[in-house]
């Protein structure tokens, strides 16, 4: 596990240095994904691989001050930025844990789970089983990330996407259908394609 975390930190050092405005195109997708969680005021949600906390403002808008948000992030660089974001905004209902999801102890059960650009977790049976164990019956899991298009002119993007996967993920499995293993652990409700099939939103339910 320590070697795995070291490799994750190495990859995420690169991501942490990317200016956040370059990910501006994901804001609409992020909002749509959070809407798909079907949360409400007072809900609890776990943000698996929360990174710098880019989803926190949108989650806060949904769950409110009476709700709770737990951010799980193995990268020290990323979670330090998430802490700065939380402190700057004055959010009191967000907790952060510097661990992989596989390392997280049994904790309270959540009303939803968000996984944004977490290809390694999408392909971790242990990680997905842990998520399943800590969400409530009927809770939604929403996964978002890039995928390799399997038809049309969009396939021309595949060489570049393959380089992206190699740079940002350890696992290189299921790049055409990153939700494949998730769908074995949860009931699939919908799979939405964005950006001409380059990005997916998977909505599942326990």
Please place each PLM-identified region on the residue numbering:
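A short acidic, Gly/Pro-enriched loop at the edge of an enzyme's catalytic core
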Residues: 102-113
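Helix-to-beta-strand junctions that scaffold the AdoMet/dcAdoMet cofactor pocket
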Residues: 64, 122-123, 135-136
């Amino acid at each position: 596990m320590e070697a795995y975390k070291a490799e994750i930190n190495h990859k995420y050092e690169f991501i942490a240095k990317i200016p956040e405005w370059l990910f501006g195109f994901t804001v609409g997708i992020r909002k749509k994904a959070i809407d798909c969680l079907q949360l409400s005021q007072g809900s609890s949600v776990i943000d698996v691989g929360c990174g710098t906390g880019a989803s926190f403002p949108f989650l806060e808008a949904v769950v409110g001050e009476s709700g709770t948000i737990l951010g799980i992030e193995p990268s020290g660089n990323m979670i330090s930025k998430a802490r700065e974001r939380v402190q700057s905004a004055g959010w009191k209902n967000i907790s952060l844990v510097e661990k992989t999801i596989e390392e997280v102890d049994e904790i309270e059960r959540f009303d939803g789970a968000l996984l944004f650009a977490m290809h390694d977790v999408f392909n971790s049976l242990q990680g997905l089983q842990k998520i399943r164990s800590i969400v409530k019956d009927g809770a939604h899991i929403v996964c978002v990330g890039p995928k390799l298009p399997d038809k049309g002119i969009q396939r021309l993007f595949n060489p570049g996407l393959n380089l992206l996967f190699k740079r940002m993920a350890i696992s290189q499995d299921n790049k055409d259908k990153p939700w494949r293993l998730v769908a074995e652990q949860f009931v699939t409700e919908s799979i939405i394609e964005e950006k001409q099939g380059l990005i997916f939103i998977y909505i599942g339910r326990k």
